[in-house]
Amino acid sequence: MPEDVIELVVEPDAKGLRLDRYVADQVADLSRSYARQLIEDGHIRLNGGDARPSASVQPGDLVTVLRPIAQPTDLVAQDIPLNVVYEDADVVVVDKPAGMVVHPAPGHLDGTLVNALLARFPDITVGGDLRPGIVHRLDRDTSGLLVVTRNDRGRHAIQAQQLARTMTKAYLAVVDGRFKEPEGLIDAPLGRHPTDRLRQAVLASGREARTHYTVVEDLGDYTLIEARLETGRTHQIRVHFSHKSRPLLGDPLYGPRKPRATFGLTRQFLHAYRLGFALPSTGAWVEFRSPLPPDLQAALEKLRARAP
């Protein structure tokens, strides 16, 4: 089977990471379990030799990923409504509703964004595993924009922009609390929570994570903010603001066990409203915006009505 060759040079902030985790972090459409399988099958090499998934990587190490080129997926295409805001030969931009899982996983084997994409765009076969075309994700209950790649040219171009941190990924969020300054930066490394596998946490040994924010509207005890990702760690915005004692309104995982109020929300107030990147085909910069969905807009109006 033909292979796609990816060479990675380990940067200082990845020092000591397990090889399988490092590869999964660097190759956006590769899960950790699939990375482990590739290592065990000899398709991932560390400094030119075989390695174990648990091997620790060090700055300057060369990691070579020899990934079998994805064949048509066995996933089932499902005719699920999909809000496509842009498409060309290389990429698709979709506006994901809250409640939709991005890719199949235990407990969510169908009804996902991937199943819907395969019905609408059956040519999406890059990526293999259970995530064809997926190069970044949104949590199940986070709504908004994300880009999906349709071929290798699109995947390589978008991944290069992610690594160079040139993409724009901006979110609207309501947090519990106020800010003294109109804007700021949260620079706090993130990793898996030491005792709760469902959560991420700020850890000295974690990966670099940086979130820029700007106050959009003072809502009394709450604040509407724009959060912009410089890095893209799991649950990054939710963990960062919880760490600063400003948890997202309605967040069931990182918010208080007994929130002061919900304002009718059944999920966290977080919406990926702005997405910008250079088109793989031409290099032209494009930017897309998504309005707040009805549940978040209704909650915002309730917050405005009670604000002093």
Language-model features: where?
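RNA pseudouridine synthases
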Residues: 1-308
